[in-house]
UniProtKB/Swiss-Prot annotation:
InterPro entries xrefs: Glu_permease_IIB, PTrfase_EIIB_Cys, PTS_EIIC, PTS_EIIC_1, PTS_IIB_1, PTS_Sugar-Specific_Components
Transmembrane region(s): 129-149, 170-190, 196-216, 230-250, 268-288, 312-332, 347-367, 381-401, 411-431, 453-473
Gene3D superfamilies in alphabetical order: Glucose permease domain IIB
Protein name: PTS system N-acetylmuramic acid-specific EIIBC component
GO molecular function annotations of the record: kinase activity; protein-N(PI)-phosphohistidine-sugar phosphotransferase activity; protein-phosphocysteine-N-acetylmuramate phosphotransferase system transporter activity
Catalytic residues (positions): 28
Subcellular location: Cell inner membrane
Gene Ontology biological process terms from the UniProt entry: phosphoenolpyruvate-dependent sugar phosphotransferase system
Cellular component terms per the entry's GO annotation: plasma membrane
Organism (species): Vibrio vulnificus (strain CMCP6)
Sequence ranges assigned to domain PTS EIIC type-1 in this UniProt record: 127-486
Amino acid sequence: MAKITQTMISQLLAAVGGSSNVSKCGNCMTRLRLTLANNGVADQAVIKQIPGVMGVVESDEQFQIILGPGKAQQAAELMNKLIESVINGDVQEQAIASDTNDLSSVAAEQKKQMKSKQTSAVQRFLSKFATIFTPLIPGFIAAGLLLGFATLLEQMFVLEQTPSQFMLDLIAYMKVFGKGLFAFLSILIGYNAQQAFGGSGVNGAILASLFVLGYNPDATSGIYSGMSEFFGYTIDPRGNIIGVLLAAIIGAQVERKVREYMPDDLDMILTSVVTLLIMGVITFVVIMPIGGELFKGMSWLFLNLNDNPLGAAILAGLFLISVVFGIHQGFVPVYFALMEAQGFNSLFPILAMAGGGQVGASLALYFKAKKDAVLRTQVKGAIIPGILGIGEPLIYGVTLPRVKPFVTACIGGAAGGFFIGLVSYLGLPVGLNTVFGPSGIVAIPLMTSHSGIFAGMAVFVVGLLISYVVGFLATYFFGSKDVDLS
């Protein structure tokens, strides 16, 4: 696979319209995420031809270039440095060939932009969740792995035994990071959410803290807020992450509106004061009760879907489509709801089966292709990341361009999801021990259940194997006919 080089980044920057067209450059684990002033200037055909680019996902809010695991962060760092150098005049930007004076071209471009705005409102909204949660993913994974290893040590050396003090201290030490993360996670999310929707992150963090504080003066744990009611109105800090997101999203809009009317000289002093006073009322009186009901409803819906084999199959089968459109981060609030309701994330292993279907489908294409086929080289380069839970190289490099294998990969994922849902229906729900984590075989140590981690790990492994096998067979016999295997 192509390395990330200065030349490649220069080509990408030129193809997206130059530094003047890039408002913001960031990344997630596998994608370079750009906020462009005008998406229509970007030449997708040229971008896709640049070595190392696996695909492009476009929305009105973000222009996502898929580069694969371990490359997106490096690309973002290089591009930000290049943009800074161009702005400072240290380097000359690569010329962009674009005929913007042609009236028909301008009209066509405007039509494209308007159509995007009309058809992708949900996609634009959900894409912001990537901005909110992607920076937190490494912490989720680290805390989850440490908790998984701590639980494993606990079951092997503590339960029904007389453990050493060192072992008890080690287990407590490995667990403390997860406790710290989840104790203040709402504040981190509030900060990111308000910032993502155009407000000040610190205001979002303060609003989120209203859900963390305690309102019972007799409570023996937590931080007492100093108030038990709001002007005679009982405070019930329900809603968890749903309430925090609602408060931050609405708070960003309120802050922007306040700033419109606030004199520049007073902006630094009063904008946040007015925003917090307004949002405090809205949060205590409206958002907390509504957020609580939404949180309960979301938990009930997905608990019932997860415990239903058909529901689980549908969720797993459709998940790859959400990845293609870049809206899969929209499931993260659901993960929080399930963590609150069950103590683990029972949706994640179901959705992870989609990656297993990709692996099986890609292996089938490998065996169907001739020994000297380019397809075999593509599969070789992407199959290991796929097994480890990073499926985008397989999606954009192998199955999606050939369409039929993508469909049969979804079928493989649905089969694995059906199995996970069936086991849950029979009384053994399994899930991730943290909100978010890696999928594929890397997720095995993070699996748990009410019957312990070994049962959770076993169910997950069997589900993955089913996804591999069904994805392979469906593709080998049905998904490779009339498909380019060169």
